[in-house]
Amino acid sequence: MDCVNISWFLITLFAAIATSTMHDGENNNVGKMLQEPTYLQSEMIESIMSRHLESFSLTESDFEDIIFMKPRSKCVKDALKDIIPECMRLGVDSIEPGLQKKAAIQLSICEFENSKVTYPSSCYNMINDNDFDSCIFDIERAPQYWTTFSGYYREITKICYEESLPFEKEQIISLYSNITKLYSKMFQDLNDSYKDSTHIQQMMKNEFKELQRMMKVILDQNEKTSEEVKEKYEEFSEQYSSMLSTSLEISKKFSLGTENLVEDMANNIKYLDFELSRISIAIEDLDFETKLTDMKNSVLDDVRNLSDESISLLDSILTNLESLDILSQDAQNITNGISQSLKKNEVLSNNMNNALIETDTQLHEHNEVIRFEFEETISYLSQFSDQAIDNAIRDTSEEITKHVATFIDSINLRLEETTTKLEEVIYNIDDLSDKVGNASSYLIEGLNLLTSNGIMDALLLTYNNVASGLESGFGMLTTLKSDIFKIVRFITACILFAILFIWSMNRLFSQNRTKHTTLSSISPIGILNFRRIFRFLTNLALWLSVMGGTLLAVIVTNFLIQLKVYISKLSTND
């Protein structure tokens, strides 16, 4: 009964410890679940285990002493081992004569051996019934042997009564001895499992601390990189906003200057028309038709040359515009890539947070599984069955091993996924940096294209050729050349710069006007406004043609005025 009480006490103790530990684990987070027991708790648990191990050792020694306190010899036990169970099972009256005869012969031989009396050789090594019959036949010949045999044969029933209780006691002692040894082994295994679980718990705690530290470092680096990219993008947007504002101001100033120039040219055309009408009336009687025809042909040749050079210049401008369109598309693609990279970084951050939450959930489930398995183990132990206890211990070990392996595999999988996602974040950050660098290079290339000297040199060459042709044909534009050249060069440069810059900015920001708050208040030019600008440029080209014709008219008028003065001088001299 002491063994039973000790066993129940141990089971109750372990159930209380397991329930308390699991209850504390449910009320704490992942970090507290992995927290090792305090020093006082460890000392208390070790003290309890050592005390009960000593109790088991003392109980085992007591059982050994009880087993060694045998009232009879081994020979007597062997002689009665077959008849006592039958006597207890069926009763004294149901003992078979053959079994009773065998027991009486064996008891007689035990007495002969204890008394060191020689007995017949046929009674040695008896195996089957014939051997026993031969032994009885030889014993019957000697009266002293037969007296001993017959006495034991008659006393079998009495011996059965006397030996039933000691036999039952031995069976009970053997049973409880086996149970005590089993519980001792189970307790030792539980003690070893507790030590192993403490070691594993400490290892898992260290690994989770290292994982937490690594995740914190990675998140800090990611946040720092995101801030740097955000600052660079804001600076880039501010520069674009400033350039766009400057281009809008230049466009407004150019529009006002163009309107004033058109008004002045209209007034000059009206004045020239009036003067030409007067001059045409004055020279009707003069014979200058041949000279005027030559002058007209020369002027037409110069105009054709100017037209050819203008066409080639327009082709060059269209080529540059196509290049600028390609650069604008590349800048647009880079901007889209930057936006997609930022979205990917956000998705990866959300996935990392979800992975941490799933890890927390799996730890909680792992704790629940351990508690459930421990409760199942306790329920099996309460049945006092050797087979049930062995099966429970084996199943519990397999389940715990399986769940621990599954949990470790899950952690390794989460670590691999986290590593892959971190590599993707680093790759996206590098790609983002390359795209920002490409965007800066494209911007610089576009600005260099806008300020390229090739277009300006072509315009200067065209107007120099026109001016030199007019000057060589008439010799009357020395004073007018420099002023007209400066005005036309300034107007042309402003027009080309405004057209190229506004067109490129429209292509770059037409689909990304809501990407940043700095640009949210600036509306793109749009297709309709671009058509208006193109229509304006067409009218401007027509106006330039009119201006060329007007310039030609001014030259002709100047020539006619000088001719009139010359004729007047000749008339005065005559």
From Swiss-Prot:
* Any single GO BP term: nuclear membrane fusion involved in karyogamy
Q: Which UniProt keywords apply?
A: Endoplasmic reticulum, Glycoprotein, Karyogamy, Membrane, Nucleus, Signal, Transmembrane, Transmembrane helix
Topology, Cytoplasmic side: 505-540
What name goes with this protein? Nuclear fusion protein KAR5
Topology Lumenal: residue spans: 21-483, 562-574
Give the function comment from the record: Required for nuclear membrane fusion during karyogamy.
Task: Name the InterPro entries on file.
Answer: Nuclear_fusion_Kar5 (IPR007292)
Q: Glycosylated at which positions?
A: 178, 191, 305, 333, 438
Give the organism, scientific name. Answer: Debaryomyces hansenii (strain ATCC 36239 / CBS 767 / BCRC 21394 / JCM 1990 / NBRC 0083 / IGC 2968)
The GO cellular component terms are: endoplasmic reticulum membrane; nuclear membrane
Is this entry keyworded Hydrolase? no
Positions of transmembrane segments: 484-504, 541-561
User: Which family does the record claim for this protein?
Assistant: Belongs to the KAR5 family.
Membrane protein topology class: Multi-pass membrane protein
